[in-house]
Design a protein with these regions (language model features):
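Short, Lys/Arg-rich flexible segments
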Residues: 2-217
Length: 217
């Protein structure tokens, strides 16, 4: 028996599963018996539209709460729409800390780096690894605050591990500025409830569309 939409949380994110409850599906059972293919198509479209709706609203909500560019949040959201005979779709949201250089337009100032309303005093914007500049700070700096550089552990080898760079030379070690997304985790349950309501609305619309086509045929 389907309990409707639900979510599962993991260390690195959360997976929302969008599906109709048994009670909702029962209401459309008679129509489904008459035109099963049309009903299945309507159900599939309703779930996929709900996934798109949920992705948009989660991106906006997290963007407002964490002061992160919507485009950066969307990169953490991955939709798995309904295909074939599946009865559910999924939306994955990665909650690992995001590089501060990705949340807006970073700007080097005389005292550090500013981006999306945040200021990293003593930091600098530079391409150290990869092909894009990031926001770094020397861990020996008096301005270094571990809260601004989450998910960082010192690596013993060459190159970045999870935000730190440990190498020989006066420039190192460095820590990369990141923004934690853990504050978004508690919102999953409320998003699932809203998604259930939206799915029911869309399912009614899509079934009505298929019904009108059936009556005209």
């Amino acid at each position: 028996m389907s309990v409707g939409s639900y979510y599962k949380s993991s260390a690195g994110g959360g997976m929302v599963t969008i599906q109709s409850s048994s009670a909702d599906l029962q209401a459309f059972q008679d129509f489904a018996k008459v035109v099963p293919k049309a009903a299945a198509a309507a159900h599939r479209r309703a779930i996929n539209k709900t996934l798109g709706w949920l992705r948009t609203h989660i991106a906006r909500a997290v963007s407002r709460q964490e002061r992160i560019a919507v485009a950066a949040v969307r990169q953490r959201l991955r939709s798995y729409p309904v295909t074939g005979g599946a009865m559910s779709g999924k939306l994955w949201f990665g909650l690992n800390a995001i590089e501060s250089s990705r949340i807006g337009r970073a700007r080097q100032t005389g005292s550090g780096v500013s981006v999306a309303g945040r200021r990293y005093q003593g930091a600098f914007l530079k391409q150290v690894y990869g092909n894009k500049p990031d926001i770094w700070i020397r861990t020996a700096s008096k301005h270094f605050d571990a809260d601004d550089y989450p998910d960082s552990t010192v690596s013993s080898g060459r190159g970045p591990s999870s935000g730190w760079v440990a190498e020989n030379g006066s420039r190192f070690p460095l820590a990369k500025a990141k923004v934690s997304l853990e504050q978004a985790r508690p919102h999953f349950e409320s998003w699932v409830g809203k998604a259930d309501e939206r799915l029911l609305q869309l399912l009614q619309q899509e079934l009505n569309f298929e019904l009108q086509k059936y009556l005209r045929s």
